[in-house]
Structure formats: structure tokens, C-alpha cells
UniProtKB/Swiss-Prot annotation:
One of its GO terms (biological process) is photorespiration. Substrate binds at residues 115, 165, 169, 287, 319, 371. Belongs to the RuBisCO large chain family. Type I subfamily. It comes from the Bacteria. It is found in: Carboxysome. The lineage of its organism: Bacteria, Bacillati, Cyanobacteriota, Cyanophyceae, Synechococcales. The basic functional RuBisCO is composed of a large chain homodimer in a 'head-to-tail' conformation. In form I RuBisCO this homodimer is arranged in a barrel-like tetramer with the small subunits forming a tetrameric 'cap' on each end of the 'barrel'. The keyword Lipid metabolism does not apply. Pfam families: RuBisCO_large, RuBisCO_large_N. Its EC number is 4.1.1.39. GO terms for molecular function: magnesium ion binding; monooxygenase activity; ribulose-bisphosphate carboxylase activity. The gene is cbbL. This is Ribulose bisphosphate carboxylase large chain.
Length: 470
């Protein structure tokens, strides 16, 4: 060993930059946007990312002789310039599948976005996309139910699901919370939702909320003859408490529960998804904290990666932004990660931000949830953008109706059904949106009032995180 081992430090690119490498079908591929420190060659920066996110460290170590480094190392196989950015570049890295525990999104992210993000040779680093190989996808549970099964359980077909978040999201007692749920569901919504930060606070303990909500859901079902539901947030201080809440929701015969998957963590989320699969429950996923990670265009993790990871970890619905509402997200980027939630195969398409072909095989799809600053005037655009396999959630756009939540729900239901009918008749619903809504309002005073109330409300701000295309 003494003859073969050369102690010291050598450049990362000598080992981890391999431009002649052809990725294998079983490799996990990642695209990083890198901005190195001044004077550090691109090849060295890219190789450092490959090394520090796989087998490498800053020094040559004797124990490398005990490992087949050529088999296990990550390899930067391509570098591309970023359009319109003279400092940043894309590094494409291939990782052998044996570096990762089967079915563990936690383990994948610990490697790819772990210590390397604090590396001094980098000014900025962003994980833009991942190509998960089919060999890894087959080890993941994925959505507990998926789009088709969820529609069957809710008996909703041919249109998006319609919902809302209960407002005010904090401060209501359990009984008053249940009352608001009932008003929304009897007014015409399919589903209502806990907000992401409702857990079990002093003003409203979780068990009290669950009981009053269950009463409201069942009463609304009896009155309307429709299947109704409410996303009961089971996110908790410990996994044990999370499962306790999920079990109680099942005892109450509720169809769907909810989890904050980023703040709760992927280990907890995968466990809860497995529980839902075994117990016949639907799982709604909120993305609270995502913008801390994904909004900066130079540093962090793009939401398309977080969306892919959620589909693998498990969830039947995921918040994706709205394009037209109050939250960040342009149309093409949003469509790109919605495709990765719902489709069985998504081709590389830089105009949608997809850097790789992604084959999902037979893994069920995830409903895209549009929520945040939307109202009846947005309905035609939302239907055109998100299509039928989505859930449109109007919080303030329901409860802010001058006649109350039931009237707000009715207005949204009439608007949605009018847009679906117009689309099915071949009309261009975005171009004819005003005419479609005003025609429907002639037969719905609730919609007429909603259109008047929200006519001046727009969220026209430039997108911070734009696609890097010329």
C-alpha cells in the first residue's frame, strides 16, 4: 500500500471531471447551477460538487484504496453556459445508483444538497433538476392513491376539484371552525382545508377541531348528496403524535388528511404516505417553507426537484402555485413541474425548465393544487393552465364574499362549471373569459356579487425566478 498511496491534495478535476463519460440508464443524474469563486476554473468547481456530493473529500486518503472509486464516484460529464449569465454555468453530474438507499428521498437529498452547499469554492449553488432512474423509482412507494383512485373515492369527474382554506387560519375555536367548514361545503365546494400552520394550538386543540370538522362534513354530505372532505392537518411535534392524529381521522371516517412535507421532513412524509396507503386514506401535501429553499434563482433547490421528490415520497395532492394569483411562479415553469407530478413520461424541455427526460413508469400521478390569491375572475385561466386533474382552492376568494362563505362557495362552483361547459363546447375560455363569467352571473346572484367585489384585484408582479432561456 505504501508504494501506491500518494498522500497530499490534488485537484478535484483530475478524478471527478470526466467529459467522455456516457451516463448509464441506472445513474441518477443531477443538474446544478454553479457560480464559483473568482479565479477557480469551471471544471474544478463542477468536479468539486461531484466529489463532495459523492465519494470525495479535500485530501487524498489511504482508505480510497479499499474502495472501487471508479464504480462509486460521482462524475461531472458535461458543463454548459447559463444563457444571459456570464458567471454561472450548469454542471451535469452522474451518480451511480448504489450511492443511495433504496426508496429514501432523505438519503438522496442528504448527499446531493448536503455539505457541498457550504463549500468555500462556490459563491452560489442551485440544484436545478434530477433525473431519477427507473431502478430507483421502483423502490419508492409514491402517491398512496393517485389521481384515478382519488376521483373514484370522491366521485368527482370531468372537472377540477374545488376547495378552500378556512379563514382566518388562526384563532377560531373548534366549534366556529367547524361552522365555517360547513358553510363552505354546503355552498358547493368539494373540499375544505386546514391551513399549514394549524396543528394543535391553545385556541384550538387538534382533537376538538377534528370532531367538529367531521360533524360539518357529514352534515354537508347529507344536505347536498355529494361526497365532501376536509384536509385534516396531521403534522405534529413527533411522528408518534402524527400517526395518533391520522388514526383518529380514520376513526371519524374522514377521507383525507394533510401533511406539511418540507417542515415535517421527508422521513415523516414517507412514513405517513405508507400509512395512508395501508389504511385507504388520501394525503394532501402542503409545501410550507419551500420558497426559503427554491425562490433565489442562484442558490438553493428548484421547486421542480422538490415536486419530483414529493411524488416519490408520497402524496396525492401538492400545492404548486397559481401563476395568476399572489404567489411566485411563471406559466411555463409551473407547467413543467405539474407535468412531473401527473404524467407517466416527461421529455426534456428547457422552455419548461426540464433538463432531463423523466420516465415515471406506472407510478400514480399527483393532483396539482392551485391556491393563493385567486378569485372568480381567475377561473378561466386556472382551468386552462391546470386542466381537470387539479384542485382549485379559493380561501379569501370564498370567505371574502359580501354574503358570506356559503355564497362565496356557490359563486366559485357556478364559475367553474360555466368554464368547464364553455371549454367542452369548444370555446377559448381565456380569450372569452369575461363573456363566459358574465353570462353565468345572469343566473347566479352570488357570482354576480363576487365578480363585482373582485374586479379590481390583480397580482401583477414580475417573476423573480425566471427560466434561463434565450
Amino acid at each position: 500500500m505504501a508504494k501506491k498511496y500518494d498522500a497530499g491534495v490534488k485537484e478535484y478535476r483530475d478524478t471527478y471531471f470526466t467529459p467522455d463519460y456516457v451516463p448509464l440508464d441506472t445513474d441518477l443524474l443531477a443538474c446544478f447551477k454553479c457560480t464559483g469563486q473568482e479565479g477557480v476554473p469551471k471544471e474544478e468547481v463542477a468536479a468539486a460538487v461531484a466529489a463532495e456530493s459523492s465519494t470525495g473529500t479535500w485530501s487524498t486518503v489511504w482508505s480510497e484504496l479499499l474502495v472501487d472509486l471508479e464504480f462509486y464516484k460521482g462524475r461531472c460529464y458535461r458543463i454548459e453556459d447559463v444563457p444571459g449569465d456570464k458567471d454561472a454555468f450548469y454542471a451535469f453530474i452522474a451518480y451511480p445508483l448504489d450511492l443511495f438507499e433504496e426508496g429514501s428521498i432523505t438519503n438522496v437529498l442528504t448527499s446531493l444538497v448536503g455539505n457541498v452547499f457550504g463549500f468555500k469554492a462556490l459563491r452560489h449553488l442551485r440544484l436545478e433538476d434530477i433525473r431519477f432512474p427507473m431502478a430507483f423509482i421502483k423502490t419508492c412507494g409514491g402517491p398512496p392513491s393517485g389521481i384515478v383512485v382519488e376521483r373514484d373515492r370522491l366521485n368527482k369527474y370531468g372537472r377540477p376539484l374545488l376547495g378552500c382554506t378556512i379563514k382566518p387560519k388562526l384563532g377560531l375555536s373548534g366549534k366556529n371552525y367547524g361552522r365555517v367548514v360547513y358553510e363552505c361545503l354546503r355552498g358547493g365546494l368539494d373540499l375544505t382545508k386546514d391551513d399549514e400552520n394549524i396543528n394543535s394550538q391553545p385556541f384550538q386543540r387538534w382533537r376538538e377541531r377534528f370532531e367538529f370538522v367531521a360533524e360539518a362534513v357529514k352534515l354537508a354530505q347529507q344536505e347536498t348528496g355529494e361526497v365532501k372532505g376536509h384536509y385534516l392537518n396531521c403534522t405534529a411535534t413527533t411522528p408518534e403524535e402524527m400517526y395518533k392524529r391520522a388514526e383518529f381521522a380514520k376513526e371519524l371516517d374522514m377521507p383525507i388528511i394533510m401533511h406539511d412535507y418540507i417542515t415535517g421532513g421527508f422521513t415523516a412524509n414517507t412514513g405517513l404516505a405508507n400509512w395512508c396507503r395501508e389504511n385507504g386514506m388520501l394525503l394532501h401535501i402542503h409545501r410550507a417553507m419551500h420558497a426559503v429553499i427554491d425562490r433565489h434563482p442562484q442558490h438553493g433547490i428548484h421547486f421542480r426537484v422538490l415536486a419530483k421528490c414529493l411524488r416519490l415520497s408520497g402524496g396525492d395532492q401538492l400545492h404548486t402555485g397559481t401563476v395568476v394569483g399572489k404567489l411566485e411562479g411563471d406559466r411555463q415553469t409551473t407547467l413543467g413541474y405539474i407535468d412531473n407530478l401527473r404524467e407517466s413520461f416527461v421529455p426534456e424541455d428547457r422552455t419548461r425548465g426540464n433538463f432531463f427526460d423523466q420516465d415515471w413508469g406506472s407510478m400514480p400521478g399527483v393532483f396539482a393544487v392551485a391556491s393563493g390569491g385567486i378569485h372568480v375572475w381567475h377561473m378561466p385561466a386556472l382551468l386552462a393552465i391546470f386542466g381537470d386533474d387539479s384542485c382549485l382552492q379559493f380561501g379569501g376568494g370564498t370567505h371574502g364574499h359580501p354574503w358570506g362563505s356559503a355564497a362565496g362557495a356557490a359563486a366559485n362552483r357556478v364559475a367553474l362549471e360555466a368554464c368547464v361547459k364553455a371549454r367542452n363546447a369548444g370555446r377559448e375560455i381565456e380569450k372569452e373569459s369575461r363573456d363566459i363569467l358574465l353570462e353565468a352571473a345572469k343566473h347566479s346572484p352570488e357570482l354576480a356579487i363576487a365578480l363585482e367585489t373582485w374586479k379590481e384585484i390583480k397580482f401583477e408582479f414580475d417573476t423573480v425566478d425566471k427560466l434561463d432561456v434565450q
